[in-house]
Amino acid sequence: DDMEWINQQLGRKAFIWLNYPVNDYCQSRMLMGKTYGNGLDINEMVSGFCSNPMEYAEASKVSLYSIADDTWNMPAYDATSSWNQAIAALMPTAPEAFRWFCENNVDLGKTGHGLRREGESPLFPQGQEAGWKPYEDFFQKQVAEASLLLADSINSPEMLTEIKPWVESMCLQGLRGLTV
């Protein structure tokens, strides 16, 4: 419905500029989440599609991989499957640690437009219902996965150079969480 409406207003097929995973409006964040939001039936309704990546070329590849997958075959696009494939392809020697990093670096935080991304730290809310143990497990996993990524930097040096400050922060957050 949205694409039909906008195309009617434009008098032509729309060109989509996806402003993701760009983080110029939330520079303290890495936007490593799944790429979603467009209908799977719009392939015949658009004239083109492009993305606005982050200033971090390697880290942007998580989303760009999915965008390429989506634009190649929109009706069959699966955001979760594509995201998992991107993670495995980009960090083949530590995919689980990289997945943990990515799923804990999703949300934009507070912005002027109020948009929030779904899926940030999916295991963290469990502690709100079950007491301290899930939090302890979460923080221990944070430290372990961050340490694994930092130790694996020889296998994906360009990626680790870009995400290292956020990986180190993830490790420190985990350590802090364990001491509280």
Where are these regions (language model features)?
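C-terminal functional modules
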Residues: 76-180
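Catalytic-core regions of glycoside hydrolase
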Residues: 1-80
